[in-house]
UniProtKB/Swiss-Prot annotation:
Positively regulates the activity of the minus-end directed microtubule motor protein dynein. Plays a central role in positioning the mitotic spindle at the bud neck during cell division. Targets cytoplasmic dynein to microtubule plus ends, thereby promoting dynein-mediated microtubule sliding along the bud cortex and consequently the movement of the mitotic spindle to the bud neck. It is found in: Cytoplasm, Cytoskeleton; Cytoplasm, Cytoskeleton, Spindle pole. It comes from Candida glabrata (strain ATCC 2001 / BCRC 20586 / JCM 3761 / NBRC 0622 / NRRL Y-65 / CBS 138). Keywords: Cell cycle, Cell division, Coiled coil, Cytoplasm, Cytoskeleton, Microtubule, Mitosis, Repeat, Transport, WD repeat. Self-associates. Interacts with NDL1 and dynein. The lineage of its organism: Eukaryota, Fungi, Dikarya, Ascomycota, Saccharomycotina. This is Nuclear distribution protein PAC1. WD repeats lie at residues 121-160, 164-212, 219-262, 264-302, 325-365, 385-424, 426-466. Residues 62-96 form a coiled coil. HAMAP family: lis1.
């Protein structure tokens, strides 16, 4: 009774009295009622003031019984549904054994929807963005030099934040390195480049969730604008390009510079790497292909009217552009040692160009050298549609994604050169960077990785996620 108020106690006592009075009304049990009135300490005034229903308690008991019956029926229905689910699971296992890898339902030529899944506000313009290759994490670099990791599914609080550089971050690369140094199995290495001329490499620990700086080196004499990381055996390699007009290749394990060369006369804005080949684009408006272990320049592409902002190698594994019916299949097979035949470039002339790379001379046990007959890229497509600088390119299957200072993201069909979709209401300012899973990444992690995500960052301090 201690949990009831005085008013509730009085109401309960009166209800009990009224109920007993109703039960014994034909039995002449006035003595019982008098005793009950005395035990419950009910006076005549309380009874006269209480005009409650004598059937209140029976009604409540009836309600409880009906509620219990409903609960019992729901429990029986849940048991039946669980049994049905178990039976269906057993039937599926008889068709597809547990150890069979079911093909991913991810569509490599997926087109992101028009609506935004999430918008993440940052404290300064977003200058670089990168998806984790297998986890639902996006890494964001800002104009103030901060590196931030967000959980795509729960982005309200960052997973990790660090002040990586004293100036703006220009690029982010993420690699799951295996047998790297002191890490026994694998670890996530996050590398950043910056206008402060440094390259930093972080271990994003799955145990602590922190971004731990493990390598830092003064890479160039000026802004480091672009980078690519990859693993060869137990070595993690990193190629970087700079405003000092050089491209360098580093071994992250010991921070040693393995190669340095100057493919351009001006700022090397962007690079892409596939095995031993580096594609570079510059403020001199040209592209160049270099065999980086030897430093041999192999070919050059000219055709843009203004500086190049981004270059991209199109590997055979990532797109069917090289096996389209109108392509020369015999000639295509000759490019097998390179593993690519086409590349893309985006420039300040508002265009994107698709290039066919000339085949260099390939000799056994020798470094490739330029062809004696052709050292010039052939422009096979010019993609027009943006109305301002094209800032970034990403490839997924036969689709090429681009972003621009015109505040739009576009998707292009590499087989036809047509723009298949434009996102014009995602951002309200210059779009600096985008990222999306490439086909090779999807195949590598299939079937565990089944995601269709596009991320982008702009000058309005926002990261947008479309999925």
């Amino acid at each position: 009774m201690s949990s009831l108020t005085d008013s509730q106690v009085n109401d309960l006592h009166c209800s009990i009295y009224r109920y007993v009075q109703w039960v014994s009304q034909n039995n002449g049990s006035s003595d019982l009622l008098n005793k009950l009135q005395s035990v419950l300490d009910i006076d005549e005034l309380q009874l006269s003031l209480d005009d409650g229903d004598q059937m209140l308690l029976p009604k409540k008991w009836g309600s409880i019984i009906r509620l219990q019956r409903a609960i019992t029926k729901l429990e029986q229905k849940c048991d039946a549904l669980q049994q049905e689910l178990d039976d269906k699971t057993k039937q599926l296992e008889t068709i597809v054994p547990k150890d069979t890898q079911i093909a991913t339902t991810t569509d490599v030529n997926w087109l992101p929807p028009d609506h935004i899944y999430a918008s993440i506000q940052n404290e300064s313009p977003v200058t670089a963005i990168k998806l984790h290759p297998s986890l639902a994490i996006v890494y964001v670099g800002t104009d103030t030099g901060r590196l931030i990791a967000y959980d795509i599914l729960n982005y309200t609080i960052p997973l990790a934040v660090t002040t990586a550089h004293s100036k703006a971050i220009t690029s982010i690369e993420v690699i799951e390195a295996h047998n790297f140094e002191e890490f026994i199995d694998s670890t996530t290495l996050v590398s950043t480049t910056s206008k402060d001329a440094q390259i930093n490499v972080y271990d994003h620990s799955s145990n602590t969730g922190e971004l731990k700086l493990i390598r830092s080196f003064n890479a160039h004499d000026s802004t480091v604008s672009s980078q690519k990381t990859w693993q060869k055996d137990n070595d993690v390699l990193l190629a970087s390009s700079s405003r000092d007009a050089t491209v360098k290749v580093w071994r992250v394990n010991d921070s040693r510079c393995l190669q340095s060369f100057s493919p351009h006369s001006e700022w090397v804005k962007s690079i892409d790497v596939l095995d031993e080949y580096i594609l570079s684009g510059s403020l001199d408006s040209t592209l160049r292909l270099t065999h980086w272990p030897s430093g041999n320049g192999l070919s050059v592409g000219t055709g843009h009217e203004f500086p190049i902002e981004r270059v991209l190698i199109i590997p055979f594994s990532d797109s069917k552009i090289c096996t389209s019916p109108y392509r020369d299949q015999n000639e295509h097979s000759a490019f097998a040692p390179l593993r690519f035949k086409y590349c893309a470039s985006a420039a300040r002339d508002n265009t994107i160009k698709i290039w066919e790379v000339p085949l260099p001379q390939l000799k056994p046990n020798s470094a490739p050298v330029p062809s004696t007959t052709n050292t010039t890229f052939k422009c096979v497509m010019t993609l027009r549609g943006h109305t301002s600088w094209v800032k970034d390119l990403k490839l997924r299957g036969d689709h090429l994604f681009s972003c621009s200072d015109d505040e739009t993201i576009k998707c292009w069909d590499l087989n036809t050169g047509n723009c298949v979709k434009t996102w014009s209401s995602i951002h309200n300012n210059f779009i600096n960077c985008i990222d999306i899973d490439r086909e090779a990444t999807i195949e590598q992690f299939s079937p565990s990785l089944q995601r269709e995500i596009l991320v982008s960052g702009d000058m309005d301090n926002k990261v947008k996620i479309i999925r």
